[in-house]
């Protein structure tokens, strides 16, 4: 079953619920028993209707558990992993740990063919993962963690497992100052340089993409590469170029055809410009460091495009394993929602309304409706526009509310991937309609790095 469907005009819908349920957020068929009749009280689904409380595999699997809780559908997770490998066209995928935030699931995906190495988000996380047995960890962001740098440079095994990100000579100075003896020497630090990938128009007056590295031109990268190579205690091993405006911006947003076409035009031009500049940057850096080990690029939304570039040796991806709601809007791939959270119904204020506990878990980024979790199951629920998702309680409107009882679960999808794990101590791993394991998140292990 394809997790996303297209109508006759090619417009993509949201991923349907398990067992081919209609799109989340849609209302039941007018006039049906569930649209206007009494609550279904856990009876069999009405023909052609979305499942109500207790009817989904997630409800059956967690019937013995109280919400709030979070689950990962392992069949969906594994299918998403296989799709990432298919799209990477033989190039290894480095897993973005921030998009998973669960050691057990990092181990699971790294055991699969086609995945190699981690991309971490803080030095403290990197050191913890290295001490836990993970190897080949690329820290994707520069660090100012002096205590962590002191630890890294004092232990050759840690230094061999972790590669730090550098885009400024001052970061090299900070690393040297953090060495236990305060001077160069000791463990050799592995270094990766980052290329800015943003798309510039009108002589730089218009920028599309994240503000990341100050290193934009090949000559700038070559100059810093020479500084690294010529400095004792450092070894230049990699180059990274993360194209967030290509990998994380959907190009087929439901109900926004003009915006979607504009995004596609922008992304086509940006991909062409970046491919040329990345090739030149890699050539410039390899002239200084011929034994460069890797060139990393990509992101879930651009895996197949980045993999087609000869200059790139590996692809970064992570969100594509959980497939949060922000990744519903891509023409080039379809994913299966794998990570969900459930909130319990605690009130029934009136017809067509239920209230669940909590639920106000917005994602990072520019504030907007797309950063909110979306009610997923049962289908046909929406937020009250005057309240939205709340800190302690969330009212939900729609005909599906009348089929819910006190204590029933409402399932949500987070807007982003790993940020869900900052709200829950554990993930219940589901296969079919069974919980087969319960594993701690980073938070559940007492590790809240950001």
Question: Which residue ranges define each predicted feature?
Answer:
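Active-site loop/helix belt of alpha/beta enzymes
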Residues: 184, 197-323
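Flexible loop/turn segments at secondary-structure boundaries
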Residues: 102-104, 129, 245-249, 302-305, ...
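Active-site-proximal beta-alpha core segment in soluble small-molecule metabolic enzymes
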Residues: 96-243, 248
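A charged N-terminal "starter" segment
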Residues: 1-30, 39-154, 445-450
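C-terminal accessory subdomain/extension
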Residues: 5, 348-450
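Active-site loop ensemble at the mouth of alpha/beta enzyme cores that anchors a bound cofactor
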Residues: 255-270, 279, 301-378
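Conserved, mostly hydrophobic/aromatic
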Residues: 77, 98, 129, 193, ...
């Amino acid at each position: 079953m394809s997790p996303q469907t297209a109508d006759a005009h090619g417009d993509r819908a949201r991923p349907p619920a398990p067992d081919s349920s209609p799109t989340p957020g849609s209302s039941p068929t007018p006039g049906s028993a569930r649209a206007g009749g009494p609550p279904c009280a856990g009876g069999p689904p009405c023909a052609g209707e979305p499942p109500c409380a207790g009817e989904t595999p997630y409800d059956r699997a967690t019937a013995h558990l109280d919400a709030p809780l979070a689950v990962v559908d392992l069949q969906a997770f594994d299918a998403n992993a296989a799709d990432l490998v298919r799209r990477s066209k033989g190039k290894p995928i480095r897993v973005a740990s921030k998009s998973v935030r669960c050691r057990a699931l990092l181990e699971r995906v790294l055991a699969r063919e086609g995945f190699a190495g981690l991309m971490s988000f803080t030095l403290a996380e990197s050191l913890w993962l290295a001490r836990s047995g993970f190897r080949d960890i690329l820290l994707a962001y520069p660090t100012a963690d002096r205590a962590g740098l002191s630890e890294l440079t004092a232990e050759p095994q840690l230094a061999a497992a972790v590669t730090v990100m550098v885009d400024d000579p001052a970061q090299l100075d900070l690393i040297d100052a953090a060495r236990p003896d305060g001077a160069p020497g000791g463990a050799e630090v592995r270094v990766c340089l980052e290329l800015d990938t943003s798309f510039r128009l009108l002589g730089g007056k218009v920028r599309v993409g994240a503000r990341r590295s100050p290193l934009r031109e090949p000559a700038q990268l070559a100059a810093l590469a020479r500084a690294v190579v010529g400095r004792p205690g450092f070894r230049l091993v990699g180059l990274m170029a993360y194209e967030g405006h290509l990998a994380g911006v959907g190009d087929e947003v439901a109900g926004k055809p003009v915006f979607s076409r504009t995004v596609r035009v922008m992304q086509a031009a940006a991909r062409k410009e970046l491919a040329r500049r990345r090739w030149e940057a890699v050539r410039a850096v390899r002239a200084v460091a011929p034994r460069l080990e890797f060139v990393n690029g990509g992101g879930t939304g651009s895996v197949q495009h980045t993999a087609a570039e000869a200059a790139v040796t590996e692809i970064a991806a992570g969100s594509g394993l959980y497939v949060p709601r922000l990744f519903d809007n891509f023409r080039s791939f379809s994913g299966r929602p794998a990570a969900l959270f459930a909130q319990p119904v605690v009130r029934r204020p009136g017809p067509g309304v239920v209230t669940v506990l909590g639920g106000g878990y917005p994602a990072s980024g520019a504030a907007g409706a797309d950063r909110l979790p979306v009610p997923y199951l049962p289908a046909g629920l929406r937020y009250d526009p005057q309240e939205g998702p709340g800190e302690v309680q969330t009212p939900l409107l729609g005909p599906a509310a009348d089929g819910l009882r006190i204590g029933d679960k409402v399932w949500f999808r987070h807007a982003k991937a790993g940020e869900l794990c900052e709200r829950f101590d554990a993930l219940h791993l589901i296969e079919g309609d069974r919980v087969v394991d319960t594993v701690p998140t980073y938070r559940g292990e007492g590790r809240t790095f950001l």
